[in-house]
Amino acid sequence: MQRFFLAVALIAATWLAAVPSPAQAAPCLLVTLTGTMSGPVLLNGVAGAGTLVRYGDDSSDCSTVKLQFDAGRGTALRLSQVDLDVGQLDAIFFTHMHSDHTDGFADLMQVRWNWNSTGPKLDVVCSADAPSPLGFTMSCRNLVVHIGDAFIQSGEIAQRISEDKRRLAGGPAELGHLITFDPRDEAQVVWSKGDVRVSAVRSTHIAGHASYRVDTPAGSVVIGGDAGNDLPAPPRPTSTSAQVEKLAQGVDVIVHSTMHPVVGPDRDSGMPPPVFYRQSATTDLGAMAKRVGAKHLMLTHLASQVGQSRHGP
């Protein structure tokens, strides 16, 4: 059984369910786009990039395991629109350290700290520190360690602890369980729980970028992030990532950011050519999905947004 719907919350979702044997609950995989905005752009209330993956069966409302991939602006609000408390997340995975993929993380962790300080820590899975040849380092570790610094420095953490001593003294960072890995061309398992396994590969966008695959008995999904081809610009056979294509062989669902030709360097779109070329083009993603045999392609991180011909203000 497969069912698709667009919820009132402006969240697109795909539902996959396996056929159960008699007297068994049907395992299911639910993939939800919690935000589809590309870059630090504000337009029509569209939330920042993020994907929620839920796995379970009929008896658990497909919610035994709940995983969030990236957390752009408004993620916690979008989760609330599908009746998911941030304290219920098992893990969050980051594809890379760009603010349009991480803006909502501080909000998510502050809310979890406020209401769930006595609950389990949240697994935060991401690349190890990734030095750039340009002389700086992309650091998910620093993001996690310092996620509550503004709240601590403003005095909010101390004030809220004075009202409820169950809250952790170190603020939201104490609720994060950091799991880092060194991305490689070959897939490696970076997280697992029960029947759910998450693998990762290196992919090209910025230093430390990774793409993920979730495998469950109900189906599989690849989260490409902002991956593009290793060659930074044409001529090249495709704009898509060879590593992501290998990771996605036989997958059920591909979730991937996309660049539409309308914002290409030959248009007056405001999109810098290097930014356009470091991501995957819409038509190339469709061709890749066909090559790997994917059943569904969910386009996200849309540049430009539907109905727009420019990127940004």
Where are the regions a protein language model picked out?
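Positively charged n-region of N-terminal signal peptides that target proteins for export
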Residues: 1-4
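Bacterial N-terminal signal peptides
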Residues: 7-17
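General secondary-structure edge motif
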Residues: 11, 59, 88, 268-269
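Intrinsically disordered and other compositionally biased segments
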Residues: 15-18, 231-233
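Binuclear metal-dependent hydrolase catalytic cores
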Residues: 24-221, 311-313
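Switch II (G3) loop of P-loop NTPases
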Residues: 71-72, 225-229
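Cap/insert and terminal regions of metallo-dependent hydrolase folds
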Residues: 207, 218-220, 228-313
